[in-house]
Structure formats: structure tokens, C-alpha cells
Regions:
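Phosphate/dinucleotide-binding and metal-coordinating scaffold of catalytic cores
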Residues: 1, 8-196
């Protein structure tokens, strides 16, 4: 089954309307001081604890590790798994530490996507994904350039504007969207810098 991923990022405040009155959800919304690209209430959800990681199948472990390595997400560790279980489904949450290059585009060079390795030994699945290289080709084939372009085309301007100078033109914002797609596309080229 496909894995759905919802991203939460915290920048400038944007009010969120919800009719869900669960205390925990209301508290999370109140504590979120930023733009939420995706936010979903998972009824009855609970954190997957570090001591439960051994029960997670290798396929899921490889897929999560591969995705985190692609987007350079360093925030899925033994101390902070950032995974939940709700109604027999596992959810990979909180991708706020992904794509760290976006905070300093001036430092991004043509070769940056290829140079950015990934410290897999820090990842919660770093020692569990024994067949990551076997999964690599299959997972990379699922991500095409048109898919990346389609995904970035859906990023709202208000999500990108806080990362750019005030008054940035719509044309420049669109170029930034395409820069995300280009960065990830270059990371996907074989041999991938985060595999091996």
C-alpha cells in the first residue's frame, strides 16, 4: 500500500479552522505557530516507541530510511522516531528537518545534491534496513521528474514566501519551486549519494 506523508512546517502564523474538538488536537493547533502544509488528526493514534522498532518489517524500514535519506531528514532517530500508529496503519510524521538546503540557497551549488551524503547510522532504521540497496532501484523508479514537478507545483506561495526576501515576484517563487524539484532529481541520479 502507498505510504501517505503529511508535512508540518513552522514559519509565520496562519490560522487553521477545525471542527475537531479533541483536546490534544486543539492543543497541537494552538501550539503550531506557523504554516501547516499538511495537518491531519489521527484518531486514537499513539507514538511508535523506540522499543517497538524491532517489530517493524524490513520493507517499511527500507522505504522510510530511503525517503529520509533522499530528503536529508535527520529527525528520525532512536530518541525521536516520529512515527505513529492509528487504526492499524503506521504514519511517518514530522518532516520539518527535511530539505535543510532550503534555508541557505546561496550555498547550493550545481554539485550540492550529489555531495550531500546521509548519516544513516543515526537513523532509527539505520541498522535494520539490510537490503536498502535492493530496494533503492525500485523506489527510485517510482519518482520521476514529472512527479517531482507536480508535487512542487502544489506548494502554496505562502509556504515559500517566508524563505525568500519580502516582495519576491511570482516568477522568482516559481523558479524556487522548480529548484526544489531539480535538487531532488539530481539526488535521484544513480549512483545516489545516500546509498552505499
Amino acid at each position: 500500500a502507498p505510504t501517505e506523508i503529511y508535512t508540518l512546517s513552522l514559519h509565520d502564523a496562519l490560522p487553521i479552522q477545525s471542527d475537531i474538538q479533541e483536546d490534544e488536537f486543539v492543543d497541537l493547533l494552538a501550539a503550531s505557530h506557523g504554516i501547516n502544509l499538511g495537518f491531519q488528526y489521527l484518531e486514537g493514534a499513539r507514538d511508535i516507541r523506540a522499543d517497538e522498532i524491532a517489530t517493524i518489517d524490513e520493507e517499511f524500514a527500507c522505504k522510510v530510511l530511503w525517503l529520509d535519506a533522499l530528503v536529508m531528514n535527520v529527525d528520525r532517530t532512536v530518541h525521536n522516531p516520529n512515527m505513529m500508529r492509528s487504526q492499524q496503519q503506521r504514519w511517518v510524521i514530522d518532516h520539518g528537518a527535511a530539505l535543510p538546503f532550503q534555508y541557505n540557497w546561496a550555498a547550493v551549488m550545481e554539485e550540492s545534491p550529489r555531495r550531500s551524503a546521509y548519516a544513516m547510522h543515526h537513523h532509527i532504521f539505520g541498522d535494520r534496513a539490510k537490503n536498502l540497496e535492493r530496494w533503492d532501484k525500485h523506489l527510485a523508479a517510482m519518482v520521476s521528474k514529472p512527479i517531482l514537478q507536480s508535487v512542487v507545483s502544489q506548494i502554496p506561495d505562502c509556504f515559500l514566501q517566508p524563505l525568500m526576501p519580502r516582495g519576491t515576484s511570482a516568477k522568482t517563487i516559481e523558479r524556487r519551486r522548480q529548484a526544489y524539484a531539480a535538487f531532488l532529481w539530481k539526488r535521484l541520479k544513480s549512483p545516489r549519494p545516500f546509498i552505499g
